[in-house]
């Protein structure tokens, strides 16, 4: 469960715009105190939006691990996977699935470099294992804006994006919100 109250900032930003933006951010990585995945040249996504208005967050559609119970590739036992693992080349662009405000841009020993974006109405998206973060806490981002690069930081078996969605602090299946 992601606890947004552990973040240094939160937002009431409004939500899931379905129009893509081509703006790009070049700010350097920032950290919050919170500890609680192939289009390498593009600065914004051209993906179509789902019925929820969110877009797929990377150029690759290769889902390597689904939401829910699974045999863990790192723990050697069954575990509950709180998102989708999407295989992609290291350094590939990661795009904001919807417009919102960055509430966490940090490092965690399990998630590696990660970002949490609040989209309003209790909906947040989570992007883990990034090699680089291009946004900072409090920054407004547009749907399709490049926010990070795919990596393998934290507990990871290779380059991928772990993409999660929370509603009211509880993880839900991201495929309810996005489709490859």
What is each of the regions a protein language model found here?
Residues 52-180:
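Catalytic cores of peptidoglycan-degrading enzymes
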Residues 1-50:
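Alpha-helical oligomerization segments with coiled-coil/rod-like character
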């Amino acid at each position: 469960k992601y606890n947004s109250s552990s973040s240094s900032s939160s937002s009431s930003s409004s939500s899931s715009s379905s129009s893509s933006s081509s703006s790009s951010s070049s700010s350097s990585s920032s950290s919050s105190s919170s500890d609680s995945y192939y289009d390498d040249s593009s600065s914004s996504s051209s993906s179509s939006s789902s019925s929820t208005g969110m877009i797929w967050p990377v150029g690759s559609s290769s889902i390597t691990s689904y939401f829910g119970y699974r045999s863990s590739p790192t723990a050697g036992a069954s575990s509950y996977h709180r998102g989708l693992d999407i295989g992609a080349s290291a350094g590939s662009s990661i795009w904001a699935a919807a417009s919102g405000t960055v509430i966490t841009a940090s490092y965690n020993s399990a998630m590696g470099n990660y970002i949490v974006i609040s989209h309003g109405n209790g909906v947040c998206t989570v992007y883990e294992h990034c090699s680089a973060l291009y946004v900072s806490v409090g920054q407004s981002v547009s749907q399709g804006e490049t926010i990070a690069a795919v990596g393998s930081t934290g507990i990871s078996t290779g380059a991928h994006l772990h993409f999660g969605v929370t509603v009211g602090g509880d993880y839900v299946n991201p495929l309810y919100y996005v489709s490859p």
